[in-house]
Regions:
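Non-heme di-metal
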Residues: 2-205
């Protein structure tokens, strides 16, 4: 994170020190949680790639990038020095892609339903209004993460990652080949990569 942004987030303390507050502890818990989530998602991405789910691997990587930035935001509010916290974190393993997606969804759910709303309430009570708002904003993002993970998990479970109900436009993530059919081809006709490289084409520009 650039110095300019670190200073901007630090200004959210509104001239008050967070040392010794519950908000300080909650920020450190959030920083630790986001940092761990980032690393879990990188490992989940590797597992998805090995199973032939390149797009899901990319989504895990993208979400890991998001979590990394969340961690940096929470870290920017801290003032330094030792802080003791008591917190629980997932000690799960890297499983199959379906199980990894469900585990990720459950972690995101806990953050936006329980942890961050509570942290926001505490920050509000302690007079850190902008920090409270930051917890609420990140919570909304985690809600989107959960919804995406659950949709992807359903696709894996139902065998719909590479097969859709109607005619679908697929794109090769490697060479850009376009294929229109219910099912992605077993191999890309252009670059000969496996089916793993195909995803549903999305036009968002």
């Amino acid at each position: 994170m650039k110095k300019e942004l670190r200073e901007r987030f630090a200004s959210y303390r509104a001239g008050k020190s967070i040392k010794g507050t519950e908000t300080e502890k909650n920020l450190l818990k959030a920083f630790a949680g986001e940092s761990q989530a980032r690393n879990r998602y990188v490992m989940f991405a590797e597992a998805a790639k090995e199973e032939g789910f390149d797009q899901i691997a990319a989504i895990f990587q993208e979400t890991a990038h998001n979590e990394d930035h969340h961690a940096q935001i929470f870290f920017a509010f801290l003032e330094g020095g030792p802080v003791e916290i008591v917190a629980g974190y997932p000690a799960g393993k890297v499983g199959g892609t379906y199980d990894n997606l469900i585990a990720a969804a459950e972690g995101e759910h806990e953050e936006f339903v329980e942890l961050y709303p509570h942290f926001a309430e505490v920050a509000q009570q302690e007079g850190f209004v902008k920090i409270a708002n930051q917890f609420r904003m990140v919570a909304k993002i985690e809600k989107e993460h959960e919804e995406r993970y659950r949709k992807l998990a359903a696709n894996v479970k139902d065998g719909k990652v590479f097969v859709k109900e109607g005619e679908t436009v697929w794109i090769c993530r490697e060479c850009g080949h376009i294929h229109t059919a219910r099912q992605a081809p077993a191999a890309c006709p252009s670059c000969q990569r496996s089916q793993a490289v195909f995803e549903v084409r999305s036009i968002n520009y």
